[in-house]
Amino acid sequence: MFKTKGNAMKISSSLKSLPYLAAALLACLSAGTHAQDDIANYPNKPIRLIVPFGPGGAGDAVARLMADRLRPMLNNATILIENKPGAGGAIGTTELARAKPDGYTLLLAFDGNLVVSPTLVKSITFHPVRDFQPIAKLVNLPIMVVAHPSVKANNIKEFIDQSKVKPGDITYGTTGVGNTMHLAGELLRTRAGMAWTHVPYASGGAKTLTDLAGGFINSAILSVSVAGPMIRDGRLKGIGVFSDKRALLLPDVPTFQEAGIGGIEASSWLGLVAPAGTPRPLVDRLNKAANEVIRNPEAVARLQALALEPTPGSVDEFDAIIKSEFAKWTQVVKDANIKVE
């Protein structure tokens, strides 16, 4: 009798809880429907595009090009460009990492602030892999080794061999300590035996180029866009490009890969990222739209005029690039014992 009564009590209790279960189920279904509606109607309000550097320059130009051309592909939504410079790009990037992952806050990331700075700067709070959702890599900005005419070497092998005759005699200038160009130089030193001395210039590429042309340093790692004009007119020597293929602006300058030196590929790049947790359907839609922009002949011409090489690709490909570069630069910083004060 007791057993039967107990079962009856359990059934009665279960029946009483049915309205609550039904309400919870309806709430879940309603939330799911709203989420699907949000994705289907995306975007239905302005999109913020954070640019972690000031107005002007190639990066800002890319942001404005993307905003103009993405708009008609995204329900004619307003895309607001917000320049947030400071701390080597960390201010704008940190803001993106803390933003709501709803597709309405994006970042024009560059390799320096996303995958290089976190390997060096302890105060940075974001993690390049955990805190962001890659959308699309947009462009490469190839970097290269360029030398003063006083350097006798005329190709990559001769350049490396010459550095070993008097280790440290060849100096290489870059735009500072701990950027992609500096780390590329350390990568060449550790993996190819390049025996040279780093000379950082906090004042930027123009001063580095001026001192190289004047013979105050005898080589440098610079962007192809900065070094290209003096190479073309014969005032400087193009030694090698760090990309996996030759630069469009300097097709006669070989890659290090062509010289049999693998594993040192490096370039600066720009790409779109969102906060981690952004719904994949939104990410895929943004990736498709971004790729359409950088495949457009007019957009390609404008980008190439800035010495930028469009790099259309998938979300997963960009994700793999971020992960591999963060791992690579972390190891280079450790091996070279690079410190940023």
Feature-to-residue mapping (PLM):
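C-terminal lobe and pocket-closing loops
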Residues: 154, 227-295, 324-327
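Short, low-complexity disordered leader/linker segments with a strong preference
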Residues: 1-44, 157, 340-341
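N-terminal (or domain-start) structured segment
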Residues: 35-130, 169, 193-221, 230, ...
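A ligand-binding cleft/hinge motif common to bilobed small-molecule-binding domains
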Residues: 113-123, 182, 186-191, 219-253
